[in-house]
Amino acid sequence: MIKLELPEKPAELTPEKERELVEKFKADGSAVWKKSYITKPLLAMTNNKCAYSEQALNQESAYMEVDHFKHKNLYQDEVVRWGNLLPSCKKCNDTKSDWDVMADPIVNPLADQPRDFLYVKAFRFYMKNEKGQNTIRALALNDRDHFVNPRSEIGFRIVETLEEYLEALQEEEPTPRRMKSLVNRIKSTLSECGPKHIYSAVLSTHILYESPVMRKLEERLQALDQWDEELEAIRRELESIALPSPD
């Protein structure tokens, strides 16, 4: 989970239209939020990921569901309120169900900074406080089959790839052409842990704080005078979304 920025409210969702949709929902319970002018900007906001688990959406069986942060049956007047709607994977949406976030608060990625409530260790989420604990439980963020195993598989693959690049840099100083190719590949691989990609909070945490490969790569590239502004920017971006352990 990473902090999200709410995009501008769709022009189509006027106060009049919002009242109309709320009344329709109250009358017949229809899915009034299933409008392309609502779902498209929500997906764009998260780069086609679940706002909670960061699982990829609209791929294979992981289709987007619209989560009402304040549950639609408990807070009917907010059924299409902009800022109450989040793109969600089925697992998170089903598990959260009718959880009352006002009675038992959970992290709202639109309003909260996840690192204030959660940290990651070995591809699993841990609580910093009660709100963090509620979040893990309400969303099943540590479900092994749905989330932990996929996160770890990707994380280990990225580390193995970076270790191969590090080994190539340590064997001997590459030719300028080979060096440029290696640096570009390192940048591309590190960017896979960034906010546009799946499981970015977990992967950035693993790369920066759990695996030694990032520190060794940085040291080697600095020694070769190849650690540049782009690599520094990538590292800072990963730091901004990582959820390191307070230990």
Where are these regions (language model features)?
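Short, Lys/Arg-enriched, disordered terminal segments
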Residues: 1-8, 242-247
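Short, surface-exposed, charge-dense and proline/glycine-enriched linear segments
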Residues: 84-99, 127-140, 204-212, 231-234
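Generic hydrophobic, helix-prone segments enriched in Leu/Val/Ile
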Residues: 4, 17, 21, 132-142, ...
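Conserved, surface-exposed functional patches that form binding/active-site neighborhoods
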Residues: 96, 100-181
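Short, charged surface segments at domain edges that flank catalytic/cofactor-binding sites
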Residues: 3-49, 73-80
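Short cysteine-rich loop/turn motifs with clustered Cys
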Residues: 37-63, 89-92
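Histidine-centered nuclease catalytic patch
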Residues: 55-87, 96-117
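C-terminal, charged low-complexity interaction regions
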Residues: 146-247
